[in-house]
């Protein structure tokens, strides 16, 4: 680890696939509370800009921090190019960027609204802790920000000026004199302390139960944010599933998720005690995303994570015992947050400005002081890789499992790969639980891309496909048909979602061309993401959720490289109507 004079920390991580990865603590959604929700996320979208033909890059905004990374496409750019590109997002020749014209901001706000729509159609993107801390269930920005468009540049400028050296963490894959000089002359010259200290209002959350869609019964127990408690939680995270942590407003919560309601009840009633045995040596080996989260979330961890190995492996017993005392003291006094699975369409909280269907109540669980049973947690196994074919009957369940557990899904031609550390029995237990099955079926929007794809590539009518939704993925991937695009170039339908999809063909159409189209549509604020799959040579199926379906359709129809196309435009409604979707099936007998 290298520490610049201003407190910026630089770590060399040769195992990462990100050539440069930069995080900023105290720079997330929390900073928007009391002001315009979404400023942090808007700033993320404004800052990141790169040539998609030379680099792969991304950024994310969390509750308490923001992070950015960039890596070159080999043969098209170098590692130093990636470092220069990321630095250019924050610095120009005059120093730290803080001037953002209104003319560009409005398009980013439109993109934020599309991201909000996408995330709430495909995922349950709700933040219970920020909501209870006077934020909202969704804090990523909405179209209503346009009402205060003239105020936003000044707010963005002030937000940028809060960046200080001690809050910056940098991971680099390779460090040489050029990279070190670039970092030292930019991030290394940030102020060591803020020029202004904003007034913050501390929020007392207390004990609450929030009822919202969730695959598990989750309890967030407040504990002291001491170094030993933090290290103890990291130990538990390393060896057990469904154990994690959350931070909000400088408060630390250790989270336990339960598959069965009776385990959750026993834990809060005190009749069951968690088995938190540390049964193997702790290695503190984490992925770069989790490690960045740790460094940014906990200012007390100022050293390299491996400097704490001796402590966690020699003082494990006393550390865990101390954490347990904190946990059960908070459970006794009701200082915890419960996320209780609920999928009802009738419950609504009028204080929720995002109009999500949720309700908040005070917990009424009586604590019994004599534990009589032990609650075992799922142990993490060695790293495994699960391959699920698109034709697998349980394909959608596995996708929902990966999303619910925040696992990355690697897409391939005939299926997906998911890396995990579950035993086969544990996966079976989760997939067969009532709560998970309800959660898996509570977001049907993701299936639309497979429904329409099946219509185009299979010999089935839309009526047949709708009658067999659960097996539609199998229909998508077993075709051997030749697709011929006819005179009808557009179908207008009504579903429970707003999206544009279809088949696009042209001799010069490639995946790179479609990626370029995606970025152009994003810059116009018309979409958040675009999914595509190649069906035949130079013929692709495209799908994108959007709140501007007509604008997206007009843009796609104007692309001259698309010599043939058939577009499906879905208008959102309370009922489904696919009646316009007709096709001819030609059978050749030989």
UniProtKB/Swiss-Prot annotation:
One of its GO terms (biological process) is viral life cycle. It comes from the Viruses. GO terms for molecular function: metalloendopeptidase activity; zinc ion binding. The keyword Zinc applies. Pfam families: Peptidase_M44. Zn(2+) binds at residues 41, 45. Keywords: Hydrolase, Metal-binding, Metalloprotease, Protease, Zinc. Transmembrane segments: none annotated. Its cofactor is Zn(2+). Belongs to the peptidase M44 family. This is Probable metalloendopeptidase G1-type. It comes from Myxoma virus (strain Lausanne) (MYXV). The lineage of its organism: Viruses, Varidnaviria, Bamfordvirae, Nucleocytoviricota, Pokkesviricetes.
